[in-house]
């Protein structure tokens, strides 16, 4: 699938208790996944994850609003990053001291099944940008929420470009509520210039749909590239039914109504480096 980095702090991190959290970390380590958000020790929590993507150094941080009321064991508060401004500010400062090209923060926040962000998300996003975040990736609502590229004015008066998506939606799920089968693969074009400066030049998305083929199907769930599948049907190169085609058209409209038509991907991003994000 091409997944390189996982963020593991979310409201289900403690569902099977502390031991389950640790088992998950150990399995990810065994499989060779880079990950952040949950930790086996304070030392691990204090260590900032940095990945080199074609010469671009990206620091990754991850936080969640809570753990579904399941308490974090006393003395093991290090095991998960909860949304706390003092903690986040401390981590962002540590990340900046490592001199990455970009800092990417994943936030498990917001209200489930709402396709619009709330004031708390907006205020937290402002706080993150002001304290050093360059890219903010939201999750938890189980549906898509808007995205934007913005210019941030820092305390010293200088400006920088930042990118924010309030929710990436469900990439893979069995939920049936409206909008929960719709998601995107987010594509960011990042350029590292000859002078070492890194810029976020453009972005687009690939709209996808989680198709349920029924309990008796060999492959019950399929991830559908909506642009590709609609185009193939309209060109006579597809064996899907008219009903599925109509579903794809409807779901694509749901996505573009939330995310905007102008950034719907019609061709590959061209540039030096591309980084893609999904929420599983």
Annotate the PLM regions.
Residues 1-280:
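Acidic, metal/ion-coordinating pockets
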């Amino acid at each position: 699938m091409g997944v390189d980095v996982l963020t593991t702090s979310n409201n289900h991190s403690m569902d099977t208790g502390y031991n389950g959290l640790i088992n998950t970390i150990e399995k990810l380590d065994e499989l060779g996944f880079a990950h952040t958000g949950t930790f086996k020790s304070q030392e691990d929590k204090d260590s900032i994850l940095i990945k080199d993507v074609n010469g671009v150094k990206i620091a990754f941080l991850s936080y969640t609003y809570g753990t579904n009321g399941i308490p974090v064991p006393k003395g093991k508060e290090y095991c998960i990053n909860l949304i706390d401004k003092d903690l986040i500010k401390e981590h962002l400062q540590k990340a900046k001291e490592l001199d990455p090209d970009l800092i990417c923060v994943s936030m498990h926040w917001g209200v489930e099944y709402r396709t619009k962000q709330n004031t708390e998300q907006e205020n937290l996003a402002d706080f993150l940008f002001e304290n050093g975040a360059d890219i903010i990736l939201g999750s938890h609502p189980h549906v898509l929420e808007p995205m934007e590229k913005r210019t941030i004015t820092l305390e010293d008066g200088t400006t920088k470009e930042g990118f924010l998506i309030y929710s990436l939606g469900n990439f893979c799920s069995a939920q049936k509520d409206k909008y929960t089968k719709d998601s995107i693969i987010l594509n960011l074009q990042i350029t590292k210039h000859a002078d070492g400066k890194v810029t976020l030049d453009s972005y687009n998305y690939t709209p996808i749909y989680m198709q349920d083929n029924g309990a008796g199907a060999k492959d019950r769930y399929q991830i559908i590239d909506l642009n590709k599948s609609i185009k193939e049907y309209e060109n006579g190169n597809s064996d899907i039914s008219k009903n599925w085609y109509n579903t794809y058209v409807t779901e694509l409209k749901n996505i573009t109504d939330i995310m905007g038509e102008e950034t719907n991907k019609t061709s590959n991003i061209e540039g030096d480096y591309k980084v893609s994000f999904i929420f599983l």
